[in-house]
């Protein structure tokens, strides 16, 4: 049986890595070994940060809701507890959007939360 050389497969694999490394600085976009290391690291960062993004957005929404709630004399936790007692099931993303874009509606929710805390 004749020897099979893997030149075609190797070239295809290396081209795929170098294509993923397009836009990297210096040797990282041109040399296979360095590019491969950077692509692997970049994929690890991408995997990690897809999960981190969810946490970051939740933090941002909570900060916005807290700031708006404090303008109405409530802390974030008391505001959320008041909404829960009132049976309002609006998620943090929507609450943060209301806090930024529709302050009148947020004020009504804050009043509702206050009323249910005092019961």
UniProtKB/Swiss-Prot annotation:
Keyword Protein transport: no
Keyword Iron: no
InterPro entries linked to this entry: Ribosomal_bL20 (IPR005813), RIBOSOMAL_L20_CS (IPR049946), Ribosomal_protein_bL20_C (IPR035566)
Example of a GO biological process term: translation
GO CC annotations on file: ribonucleoprotein complex; ribosome
Any one GO molecular function term: structural constituent of ribosome
Entry-linked NCBIfam families: rplT_bact (TIGR01032)
Family to which this protein belongs: Belongs to the bacterial ribosomal protein bL20 family.
Function per UniProt: Binds directly to 23S ribosomal RNA and is necessary for the in vitro assembly process of the 50S ribosomal subunit. It is not involved in the protein synthesizing functions of that subunit.
Protein name per the record: Large ribosomal subunit protein bL20
Gene source species: Geobacillus sp. (strain WCH70)
Gene behind this protein: rplT
């Amino acid at each position: 049986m004749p020897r099979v050389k893997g030149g075609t497969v190797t070239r295809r694999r290396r081209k795929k890595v170098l294509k993923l490394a397009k836009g990297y600085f210096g040797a990282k976009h041109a040399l296979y070994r360095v590019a491969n290391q950077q692509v692997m690291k970049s994929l690890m960062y991408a995997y990690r940060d897809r999960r981190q993004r969810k946490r970051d957005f939740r933090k941002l929404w909570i900060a916005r809701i807290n700031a708006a709630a404090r303008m109405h004399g409530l802390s974030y936790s008391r505001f959320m507890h008041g909404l829960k007692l009132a049976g309002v099931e609006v998620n943090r993303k929507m609450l943060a959007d209301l806090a930024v874009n529709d302050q009148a509606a947020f004020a009504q929710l804050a009043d509702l939360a206050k009323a249910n805390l005092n019961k």
